[in-house]
């Protein structure tokens, strides 16, 4: 018997069919259908009451609060704050996946924020280095949001718009006297005429007129260590974009990501919290007027990397309202963070778990007993411990557990695990501001010695290896030296900022976009070039890490707030409206250009430049991206030279180092107990000309480009590698020809053919080793395998997976038990192939200590 088709959304009919299947057809069909239709139709029957907003969810009724916004163009928003999406992860539930919340019978007031998840607070204030730039001079206000801490913290906040701003604006432009138009109205007479003349349907948001609204779930950043969704008010974005916005609290730090590397504590509880929040959203958002088939996750910094990781997890599949091709969400926006950065994944979880256990008196060999001991400790004792990770890495964060994250993120991306999601991602122009601020003592720029030290320390921590480190160090210095203005301290500061930005953010984002677009999946890339003018950040700073967040949330449209104390201009308001339109369009259709066009006539009488720009999809070939700033334009190949330095050249230099070990003088590795930093103010800068002092003058520091150091130059290494390879190929060819000729005359005259090698022929063995590093198997998967002479082609090096080396922790082999389930990359033993952004195999070989250590105890990267 076919069911009559009504005009209800598809997901309601899916709910009806699912109910029929679940209950079976044994009961009278009429009663079964009636019960199912009533259950599914209840989703549509609930219209929010502005006076008493009450919603009945699957777990009980909740009451929200209506909030007016400080802008005439923005309609009121109904807020539901502190809504539980999981049971409290306390007691035995600590270090366990979340469970659904218990239902409640009374009406629950959702008018106040719930407690935030436990996090480390130093003297009542969050560590400055971990926060976005606009928070650094307002820490007292920020810290007030995280004072109320509890392990019972798994709550979310829902912001529901009450009016369609775009529809109201057009209606008021046509008929200003209508009751729906508030006194004074948002539009001038000229603007009214402009909008009245444009009567086309292209300005109408057809898909959202009266139907379920798209949903945007925001994941906050904070290096997986601090922060809360309570900090981010989604009201303006919800009202202006006509979408439902949700912010989430999830477990952080030790409580959210501790892993013993086995079944005792698998880790990734914070990610599982986010998955549970998405599951709750998928099953309940219909009661708030939301569309469970149009859920977009977005986040900045570590929140962006969480977004990326969620697209790679099979736990994100299984939306009850959809078919098998739809998951808990359908689209993703990763702002200034992907799963390929050095700080995105912890590859040493068991080591840090042991360190924590030792500090709190739980240092037992059995991991089950260790976890039981940690479960009995007060949470404050755990989160306050000083666990120092390697620089540019994290101690407690997502791990490759073979389950939530089944493999290295780059491998999962190559396998197309995220191809079913539409993805938008991007970076800010000057993400690495905080790293540079820790080096700069004044506004005068960076001295040559500080520049040399910063680069050396960077290489030591991320690419340190015993031999040939100088090659990589000097190459990076060379590439990030502005040779037209190399003596200018301000120029050095600018290039150093670019170095940190390119390595930690830009190159991982481009690599992620390349991998996603390779499958033909919709990919959009942006570069954010604007920040508000304020005295709280240096005048020389570009758009820093997190500077896009207030524009995404629409803060400029309501003026300065205590969290965003900036004097926003009309340009800021216009740009925020543009960004919100792009973001919400993407949430609605997967295309940031549709369905709502760029129109900010309520701010400026003249059209903005974004009206003439079409944001083109990204592809690996063209690498088109949108320059978001006051002068927008679509450009191609963002920072291509520097990106390919990290993705292509650096891995080759790492492999060439293995070759140079056979051909250059071996330098003894400095003792791990000896660390130093150059202290002389008049040391010769790396960009200066050749020194005129005698080389035997101990007071004169030789230039890194001196003749006696040319053994370490890239050119010489390449020359030696290619020359040795060609020589050996010639030897092989000559030997094969001679052997063939000799074999013909074998019956007549036996002659001894030259031997390829002997057991004690060290020189020739070295040549064979060199050759093995220069040949490439002609297989499509580009992996270094066994090489046969008839299958080889000459090349400079065998490039490893360029992202696998990017995140490798610089410490020694992780502490893993025999029943380990955490999947450490299989290239750790022996010579490690280079991950583009992190390959150091021995963290204790750092030759230079950082002069400005980070104050936070768990993470050294502000994301």
Curated annotation (Swiss-Prot):
GO terms for molecular function: amyloid-beta binding; cell adhesion molecule binding; identical protein binding; neurexin family protein binding; PDZ domain binding; scaffold protein binding; signaling receptor activity. The chain crosses the membrane at residues 718-738. The keyword Oxidoreductase does not apply. Its main location: membrane. It is a single-pass type I membrane protein. Residues 851-863 have a biased composition (Basic residues). Pfam families: COesterase. Disulfide bonds join 117-153, 362-373, 532-566. It comes from the Eukaryota. Residues 46-717 are extracellular. Expressed in the blood vessel walls (at protein level). Highly expressed in brain through prenatal stages, and at lower levels in pancreas islet beta cells. Residues 739-863 are cytoplasmic. Residues 1-45 form the signal peptide. Residues 194-206 have a biased composition (Acidic residues). Glycans are attached at residues 109, 323, 363, 567, 703, 706. Residues 681-690 have a biased composition (Polar residues). GO terms for biological process: AMPA glutamate receptor clustering; AMPA selective glutamate receptor signaling pathway; calcium-dependent cell-cell adhesion via plasma membrane cell adhesion molecules; cellular response to calcium ion; cytoskeletal matrix organization at active zone; establishment of protein localization; excitatory synapse assembly; heterophilic cell-cell adhesion via plasma membrane cell adhesion molecules. InterPro entries: AB_hydrolase_fold, CarbesteraseB, Carboxylesterase_B_CS, Neuroligin/BSAL, Nlgn. Keywords: Autism, Autism spectrum disorder, Biological rhythms, Cell adhesion, Cell membrane, Disease variant, Disulfide bond, Glycoprotein, Membrane, Secreted, Signal, Synapse, Transmembrane, Transmembrane helix. Interacts with neurexins NRXN1, NRXN2 and NRXN3. Interaction with neurexins is mediated by heparan sulfate glycan modification on neurexin. Interacts with NLGN3. Interacts with AIP1 and PDZRN3. Interacts (via its C-terminus) with DLG4/PSD-95 (via PDZ domain 3). Interacts with GOPC. Cell surface protein involved in cell-cell-interactions via its interactions with neurexin family members. Plays a role in synapse function and synaptic signal transmission, and probably mediates its effects by recruiting and clustering other synaptic proteins. May promote the initial formation of synapses, but is not essential for this. In vitro, triggers the de novo formation of presynaptic structures. May be involved in specification of excitatory synapses. Required to maintain wakefulness quality and normal synchrony of cerebral cortex activity during wakefulness and sleep. Belongs to the type-B carboxylesterase/lipase family. It is linked to Autism 20: A complex multifactorial, pervasive developmental disorder characterized by impairments in reciprocal social interaction and communication, restricted and stereotyped patterns of interests and activities, and the presence of developmental abnormalities by 3 years of age. Most individuals with autism also manifest moderate intellectual disability. The transmission pattern of AUTS20 is consistent with autosomal dominant inheritance. This is Neuroligin-1.
């Amino acid at each position: 018997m076919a069911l009559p088709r009504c005009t209800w959304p598809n997901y309601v009919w899916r709910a009806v069919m699912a109910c029929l299947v679940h209950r079976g057809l044994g009961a009278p069909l009429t009663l079964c259908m009636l019960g199912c239709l009533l259950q599914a139709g209840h989703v549509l029957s609930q219209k929010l009451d502005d006076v008493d907003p009450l919603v009945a969810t699957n777990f009980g009724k909740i009451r929200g609060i209506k909030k007016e916004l400080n802008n005439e163009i923005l309609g009121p928003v109904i807020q539901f704050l502190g809504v539980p999406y999981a049971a409290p992860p306390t007691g035995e539930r600590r270090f366990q996946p979340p469970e659904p919340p218990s239902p409640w019978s009374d009406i629950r007031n959702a008018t106040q924020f719930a407690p935030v998840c436990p996090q480390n607070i130093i003297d009542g204030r969050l560590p400055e280095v971990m926060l976005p730039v606009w928070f650094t001079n307002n820490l007292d206000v920020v810290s007030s949001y995280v004072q109320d801490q509890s392990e019972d913290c798994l709550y979310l906040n829902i912001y529901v718009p009450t009016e369609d701003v775009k529809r109201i604006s057009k209606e008021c432009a046509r008929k200003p006297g209508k009751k729906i138009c508030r006194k004074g109205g948002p539009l001038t007479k000229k603007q009214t005429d402009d909008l009245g003349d444009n009567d086309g349907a292209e300005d109408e948001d057809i898909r959202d007129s009266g139907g379920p609204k798209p949903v945007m779930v925001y994941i906050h950043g904070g290096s997986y260590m601090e922060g809360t969704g309570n900090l981010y008010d989604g009201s303006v974005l919800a009202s202006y974009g006509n979408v439902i916005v949700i912010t989430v609290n999830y477990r952080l730090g030790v409580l959210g990501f501790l892993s013993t590397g086995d079944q005792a504590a698998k880790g990734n509880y914070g990610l599982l919290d986010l998955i549970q929040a998405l599951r709750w959203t998928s099953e309940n958002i219909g009661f708030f007027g939301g569309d469970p088939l149009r859920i977009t996750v977005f986040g900045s910094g570590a929140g962006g990397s969480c977004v990326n990781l969620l697209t790679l997890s099979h736990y994100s599949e299984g939306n009850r309202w959809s078919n098998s091709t739809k998951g808990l969400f359908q689209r993703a926006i990763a702002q200034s963070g992907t799963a390929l950065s050095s700080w995105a994944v912890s590859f040493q979880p068991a080591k840090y778990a042991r360190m924590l256990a030792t500090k709190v008196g739980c240092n037992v060999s059995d991991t089950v007993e260790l976890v039981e001991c940690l479960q009995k400790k007060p949470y404050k004792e755990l989160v306050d411990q000083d666990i120092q990770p390697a620089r540019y890495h994290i101690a407690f964060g997502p791990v490759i557990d073979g389950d939530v994250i089944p493999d290295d993120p780059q491998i999962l991306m190559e396998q197309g695990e995220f191809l079913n999601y539409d993805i938008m991602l991007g970076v800010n122009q000057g993400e690495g501001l905080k790293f540079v601020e820790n080096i700069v003592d004044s506004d005068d720029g960076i001295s040559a010695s500080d520049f040399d030290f910063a680069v050396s320390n960077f290489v030591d921590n991320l690419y340190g290896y015993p031999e040939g480190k100088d090659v990589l160090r000097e190459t990076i210095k060379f590439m990030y030296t502005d040779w037209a203005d190399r003596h200018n301290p301000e120029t050095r500061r600018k290039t150093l900022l670019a170095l940190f930005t390119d390595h930690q953010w830009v190159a991982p984002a481009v690599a992620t976009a390349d991998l996603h677009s390779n499958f033909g999946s919709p990919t959009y890339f942006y570069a954010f070039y604007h920040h508000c003018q304020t005295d709280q950040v240096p005048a020389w700073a570009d758009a820093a890490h997190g500077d896009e967040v207030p524009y995404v949330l629409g803060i400029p449209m309501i003026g300065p707030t205590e969290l965003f104390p900036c004097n926003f201009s009309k340009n800021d308001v216009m740009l925020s409206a543009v960004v919100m339109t792009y973001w919400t369009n993407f949430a609605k259709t997967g295309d940031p250009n549709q369905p709502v066009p760029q129109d900010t006539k309520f701010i400026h009488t003249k059209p903005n430049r974004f009206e003439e720009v079409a944001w083109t999809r990204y592809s690996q070939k063209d690498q088109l991206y949108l320059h978001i700033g006051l002068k927008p334009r679509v450009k191609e190949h963002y920072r291509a030279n520097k990106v390919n330095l990290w993705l292509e050249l650096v891995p080759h230099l790492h492999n060439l180092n293995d070759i140079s070990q056979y051909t250059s003088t071996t330098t003894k590795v400095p003792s791990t107990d000896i660390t130093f930093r150059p202290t002389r103010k008049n040391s010769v800068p790396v960009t200066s000309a050749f020194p005129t002092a005698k080389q035997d003058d101990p007071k004169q520091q030789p230039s890194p480009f001196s003749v006696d150091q040319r053994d370490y130059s890239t050119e010489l290494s390449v020359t030696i590698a290619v020359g040795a390879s060609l020589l050996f190929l010639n030897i092989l060819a000559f030997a094969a020809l001679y052997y063939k000729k000799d074999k013909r005359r074998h019956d007549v005259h036996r002659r001894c053919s030259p031997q390829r090698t002997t057991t004690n022929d060290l020189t020739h063995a070295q040549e064979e080793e060199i050759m093995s590093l220069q040949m490439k198997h002609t297989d499509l998967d580009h992996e270094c395998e066994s090489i046969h002479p008839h299958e080889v082609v000459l090349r400079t090096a065998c490039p490893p997976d360029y992202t696998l080396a990017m995140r490798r922790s610089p410490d020694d082999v992780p502490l893993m038990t025999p029943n380990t389930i955490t999947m450490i990359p299989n290239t750790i033993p022996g010579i490690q192939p280079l991950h583009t952004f992190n390959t150091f195999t021995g963290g204790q070989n750092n030759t230079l200590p950082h002069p400005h250590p980070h104050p936070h105890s768990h993470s050294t990267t502000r994301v």
